[in-house]
UniProtKB/Swiss-Prot annotation:
Residues engaged in binding phosphate: R89, G127, T128, R129
Similarity comment text for this entry: Belongs to the RNase PH family.
Catalytic reaction equation(s): tRNA(n+1) + phosphate = tRNA(n) + a ribonucleoside 5'-diphosphate
PANTHER family for the chain: EXOSOME COMPLEX COMPONENT, EXOSOME COMPLEX COMPONENT RRP41
Oligomeric and partner information: Homohexameric ring arranged as a trimer of dimers.
EC number in record: 2.7.7.56
Entry protein name: Ribonuclease PH
Keywords: Nucleotidyltransferase, RNA-binding, rRNA processing, Transferase, tRNA processing, tRNA-binding
Length: 241
């Protein structure tokens, strides 16, 4: 039996990825990133203050918030603000985004400033956290480039690019960049965050059905590395445009 994906993509093929910069007017950096039918708005906001634990140390901070619009999925969900607290999934994802982006920043070069990346899912079709990281990096780059242009910082604080992609085992086959039909029916789901030097920043992998073997893990990481090459090229092209 011939293996096929619901989307018709090959096992090592990303969804169509678009990165649109300067999507909003007020933020120092803003990007609409699309991985197929997953659309995430990422904005970077600069504030001349840092959390209390960093005051007087000459270091900056990079953090993130994440949320989904009520009708970003098939059925409406109440806003978390209406519930009075953020859910565990939201907290986990925004911490992941913050960790990923801090890994590419020289915080001493940033000075005592905070850059907050707000990642709002407009439409979800799988891979929202990986799309958010990939788009938020471009928004962050635009924000720090603006600080350099204004003369507010002297040294570029970015020490490399960061992107993320999902991989998984779907119907027994390792695949790249799962959409919702695959994500909801896969045996293994993994999110991979890397820098453009080939280093791994974070791996989040779970066997949803059958346990995965070491050779399957190696195949998933190889797929992720291939996808990262494409994503870093798209980020560079967007920032050069």
């Amino acid at each position: 039996m011939t293996f096929s994906r619901p989307s018709g993509r090959t096992a090592d093929q990303l969804r169509p990825v678009r990165i649109e910069r300067a999507f909003t007017r007020h933020a120092e950096g803003s990007v609409l990133v699309s991985f197929g039918d997953t659309h995430v708005l990422c904005t970077a906001s600069v504030e001349n203050r840092v959390p209390n634990f960093l005051r007087g140390k000459g270091e900056g901070w990079v953090t993130a918030e994440y949320g989904m619009l009520p009708r970003s999925t098939h059925t409406r969900s109440d806003r978390e603000a209406a519930r009075g607290k953020q859910g565990g999934r939201t907290l986990e994802i925004q911490r992941l985004i913050g960790r990923a982006l801090r890994a590419c920043v020289d915080r001493n070069a940033l000075g005592e400033r905070t850059i907050t990346l707000d990642c709002d899912v407009l439409q979800a079709d799988g891979g929202t956290r990986t799309a958010a990281i990939t788009g938020a990096y471009v928004a962050l780059a635009d924000a720090v480039n603006l600080l350099l242009k204004r003369g507010e910082i002297k040294k570029h604080p970015l020490i490399g690019a960061v992107a993320a992609v999902s991989v998984g085992i779907y119907r027994g086959e390792p695949v790249l960049d799962l959409d919702y039909p695959e994500d909801s029916d896969c045996d293994t789901d993994m999110n991979v965050v890397m820098n453009d030097g080939g280093g791994f920043i974070e791996l989040q992998g779970t066997a949803e059905g059958h346990a995965f073997r070491r050779d399957e893990l190696n195949a998933l990481l190889a797929l992720a590395e291939k996808g990262m090459g494409d994503l870093f090229a798209l980020q560079r092209a967007a920032l050069a445009g």
